[in-house]
């Protein structure tokens, strides 16, 4: 018998997302992903100076702020053919790597972990046994019986008070929760420790960016960070050493806690290495430029089709015509006019709401395609592209997670299993581990270049008063490939479009009626209790949705009431 469930809104994400599923014999047979806000930021920046756009568009989201700012700056620099000083590139790279580290840690612990961890079960744990379980896989100094006892007492106090606070909402006791009490206790302890680690990542961003969220140091042509090692109120030696101290602390947590916890979750939920397979076409752009023209990068980019790593096609730069010409957005199933596929430079954002319809329009998110195909972007795509490109560091980081998984289970983990819900999470962890190397590398590069006497961080842009210029700023954001598309005419912005990662992944059916990545990933998912569809939420959360980026403007009521309807 067929059932219909609606989860509206999906919580523990950024923004507003509705998921509808049809369930046949306890398994999802069809799914619809609906963004329930409209983003009009593109309209706001029209007729403005292109140098102002980055400051405005980073307000698209309070989480992904840095990435939108940097992508917008790159778009303007692309349009105006500006060479960026390498010191500015190093500073931007450090900010991006720290921001992404923060984002990945927040996702795993605060947004996703509670889909796998039963908080109440931790009350039955033995703190000493929990500590013993981690010996041989982690040297983290807070994995002690004393620390786990403190955390357990905190949980007891919350339960006794009748107010669970941040742990108030969850499917505790759900039959799909499988972790032993000790592992649940470990996870809760690391959840709380991650809050402090996030602060260290944000300190790196704020020390260079002026503040976070919404950094202030970017400029079309570089960064507003004057360098003088002996000066005051500038980027001096003392501030650089302070930044380095936080970079080192981040690396310890990522390697000894985050990486281990990922392997532990996979070890106890191996069936989720076979569920959640999405679009299986993967797209990622090169990132962390080391030259002034965004032509040389530390991370490679590329495209993989139909889950076949041998189909890998490299994307070598942000001006790669193969990449630029392949991207279109359609609105056949979105609440906009102009339904046919459009290239972003010619894209329109004219709302046309006419109600929710299974076979018609049902989302404020557009549907992007790459040469007509639905693709997935994000850390899984990024990892698979780097594996296909033969990047040794990526393989090594993945091998480290697999080794822990193998030690816990006695089983190996193959690349084919990564096209899955847990594959998204593993890809994000691999990315975060690699980012620690990027932070160290780019910090050293900055110090070395300053030592050579190069203190340049900005070149003044020349914006012609007449003529039309097009630019695109690509960026590998925490959730995947981000692009801002800018058209400058007679010195001001005449058109602007942002094609964001969660648009690629949460998009509705495209112009050819092919389902989007979220929708495809849910098909075949078993649901034990339609009133508590934890399994559906697990897969959606594994993508780390940011609907505030994908769409933008709340409804008139502004109510945030979670409901699960079973029809």
Identify what each model region corresponds to.
Residues 494:
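Catalytic-core signal marking the mid-to-C-terminal active-site face
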Residues 1-479, 489-490, 500-567:
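Active-site bordering "gate/hinge" segments
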